[in-house]
Structures are given as structure tokens and as C-alpha cells.
């Protein structure tokens, strides 16, 4: 697709030497990415943004950007944790197609020194993700979603 601006794939988590490819979190992310699997429609802003209304289902290391089409700098965010989610939502509003290949083409290692764990400990992750949900939902709905979403933080323990 010559108008592709973002390409992403599924991934396998490597945690304490074990490969994880079918836990609940990964299945939820696959479901959230479904709108990006329709090539006849995945160039529409509303459909691209639909993939992000219940969280960021995209693993940044499993993502490639068409920098020439997006311009520089193509990453612009004030966030330190939710910057990928914030940036992808912004890019979804730009012309171009988001392509998702659900084959797991990346192994993603979760480890003790991961930035994600630090952001959970200092509450940065919660604050930034709540702000992102408030972009899509009224605050009471965002708080309900965060109640469920926060349970996924245990995946990093």
C-alpha cells in the first residue's frame, strides 16, 4: 500500500525466559487492533482512532513508520509513558493507512528494569493513561475503564 504510514504486527512476550503468546492481555490487544485489519477502510481517521479508544493495542517496538510520508518530527508528545499512544492517535488523524499484520514478528522482553515498571511505581502510567481515556470518554466512563485497565499492570510483576 503506497499510502501506508504505520505498519504494526503482533508479538510474543518473553518473561523470565518463557514465551507468552496467548494470555488475556494479548488477546484483548488483538481484538482492539481489528479495525486496522480492513485494508479497504484502514485509511479512514475514525477507523484508525477506533483501535485506540480502549487503550493502546500496539507494541511500539513492533511498529514501523513511513517517515517520508509523515514528515519530521513524526513523534510529538508531551507524555513520557503514553507518548506512543498519544502519537498514534495524532497520526491516525493524518492521511495515510495503518496496516496491521497479526503474525507475531517480534519477541518483546519484559524485565525488572523496564521503563513500564518504573512508570507504574511512580503513578505516571496511571495519570497519563487516564488523560488519554478522557480524550475519548467522559471522565466517569474513563474512570471505569481505568479500573479494568489498571489490573493489567500486574502483567509487569
Residue ranges and their predicted role:
Residues 1-5:
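Conserved donor-nucleotide/metal-binding helix-loop-beta segment in metal-dependent transferases, i.e.
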Residues 7-20:
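Short beta-strand-to-loop element that shapes/binds the nucleotide-sugar donor at the catalytic cleft/hinge
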Residues 9, 22, 27-126:
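Conserved nucleotide-sugar donor-binding catalytic segment
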Residues 12-13, 113, 154:
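Short, internal active-site loops enriched in acidic
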Residues 134:
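Juxtacatalytic substrate-recognition/specificity segment
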Residues 137-138:
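TPR/TPR-like (Sel1-like) alpha-helical repeat modules
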Amino acid at each position: 500500500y503506497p499510502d501506508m504510514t504505520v505498519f504494526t504486527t503482533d508479538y510474543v512476550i518473553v518473561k523470565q525466559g518463557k514465551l507468552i503468546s496467548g494470555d488475556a492481555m494479548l488477546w484483548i490487544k488483538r481484538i482492539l487492533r481489528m479495525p486496522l485489519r480492513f485494508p479497504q477502510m484502514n485509511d479512514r481517521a475514525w477507523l484508525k482512532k477506533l483501535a485506540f479508544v480502549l487503550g493502546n493495542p500496539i507494541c511500539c517496538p513492533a511498529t514501523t513508520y513511513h517517515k517520508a510520508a509523515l514528515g519530521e518530527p513524526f513523534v510529538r508528545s508531551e507524555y513520557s509513558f503514553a507518548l506512543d499512544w498519544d502519537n498514534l492517535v495524532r497520526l491516525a488523524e493524518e492521511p495515510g493507512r495503518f496496516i496491521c499484520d497479526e503474525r507475531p514478528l517480534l519477541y518483546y522482553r519484559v524485565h525488572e528494569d523496564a521503563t513500564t515498571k518504573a512508570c507504574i511505581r511512580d503513578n505516571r502510567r496511571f495519570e497519563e493513561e487516564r488523560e488519554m481515556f478522557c480524550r475519548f470518554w467522559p471522565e466517569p466512563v474513563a474512570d471505569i475503564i481505568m479500573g479494568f485497565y489498571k489490573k493489567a499492570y500486574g502483567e509487569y510483576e
